[in-house]
Amino acid sequence: MKKGIRYETSRKTSYIFQQPQHGPWQTRMRKISNHGSLRVAKVAYPLGLCVGVFIYVAYIKWHRATATQAFFSITRAAPGARWGQQAHSPLGTAADGHEVFYGIMFDAGSTGTRVHVFQFTRPPRETPTLTHETFKALKPGLSAYADDVEKSAQGIRELLDVAKQDIPFDFWKATPLVLKATAGLRLLPGEKAQKLLQKVKKVFKASPFLVGDDCVSIMNGTDEGVSAWITINFLTGVLKTPGGSSVGMLDLGGGSTQIAFLPRVEGTLQASPPGYLTALRMFNRTYKLYSYSYLGLGLMSARLAILGGVEGQPAKDGKELVSPCLSPSFKGEWEHAEVTYRVSGQKAAASLHELCAARVSEVLQNRVHRTEEVKHVDFYAFSYYYDLAAGVGLIDAEKGGSLVVGDFEIAAKYVCRTLETQPQSSPFSCMDLTYVSLLLQEFGFPRSKVLKLTRKIDNVETSWALGAIFHYIDSLNRQKSPAS
């Protein structure tokens, strides 16, 4: 329920000292007074109406301004201050004196749209702590509505309702609302992508949350990797401990894949190609990260490339896509990015894994930069890395776990050998496991390298969303306090 504005009129009482006599001149004066009061009334009513309108307009301007002021009173550091030295805000202060604030991040990926609602607390003079996350996902991805933009709004509104239910009413106008689109929209023609973003922005503007001009955007791949790196290192406590040993991040999405880590060797910095290094400022510290996103090498896009298809285009004349990575007896359909392809296996002249590995190597040839330092950095991997490993029993499906890179190759050989004679319900498993095995080796990981695969840390999703909302809040801080 929206708060209304109550206007009350006030009356001033005038005291007139009159002569006790009641002669003819007093009677005439009363008539003049009555006549004058009518004229005053005719002027007073329009004047009062104008004053009322002025007060209302002033109130609306004040109300809008306080939305931004309320947010910064909770999150903005004073010039030169560290996180935790923010101005006190009664709106965002818990009973124990810790400041409380929220952030909403929409992840518009290639296979679905997800909302993350984060609640943070900040003890005095310390970095923030994540105290709660609400997560909900809807399918298909936003890019599926490229030719019917109006339909995209329904899912966005449904996810906004999740945020409204999770965030107390008094915090709505102070809570930043952001949507970042990833590979799904990056692969769309520019005009179609912009129409989708404009529709989402219109829905956001109608919401009660704090919405900036940059609230909706397509996230570039580098930022996606950086944000995921922030998430992992925040959840593992590294960012709270100056000088702590950071961990690297591997994310395998549907349309793109990212790698990010903090180099410790000068040679890594010098050998990195242009565009692979980025400076990140968080919690008043600056990090120089190795971060890169490979568009088209996400698991679903890689499948299409291995099959010989072209992104966003149906096969010519409905032609069947034949692949050495599928069971020789398999025939079926596969849908990707709203396009349905007819696919089939082919008779194998050698082992299925051997032929598939050769095809995958062709797709990956000269597309991935290899760096030696990854051998010596602890890495977390998630998204499709996790799903594939859990699907073949390499890790616990609920808890995650650790494995060595070579485990993917062992699993790939086993699954491919099984598919040669026993087609099963996962026709792409040989292809996917072979692809992941070779992709990791192309990055420079030896078969003996241990990776930690996790879906959640402290019950929080290990996606880029948390890091992105932190980065967004930090950028708002710097806009308001350039000296900080």
Describe the role of every protein-language-model region.
Residues 2-11, 15-38, 103, 117, ...:
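Helical "lid/coupling" subdomains associated with nucleotide-phosphate turnover
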Residues 35-48:
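Membrane-interface recognition of transmembrane alpha-helix starts
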Residues 41, 55-68, 394-396:
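Transmembrane-helix exit/juxtamembrane "anchor" motif
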Residues 45-57:
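Hydrophobic membrane-insertion alpha-helices, especially the h-region
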Residues 62-81, 127-131, 483-484:
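Interhelical loop segments of eukaryotic multi-pass membrane proteins
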Residues 76-97:
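N-terminal low-complexity, Pro/Thr/Ser-rich intrinsically disordered segments
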Residues 98, 106-114, 250-256:
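A short acidic Gly-Thr/Ser loop motif
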Residues 124-133, 211, 268:
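Beta-strand initiation motifs
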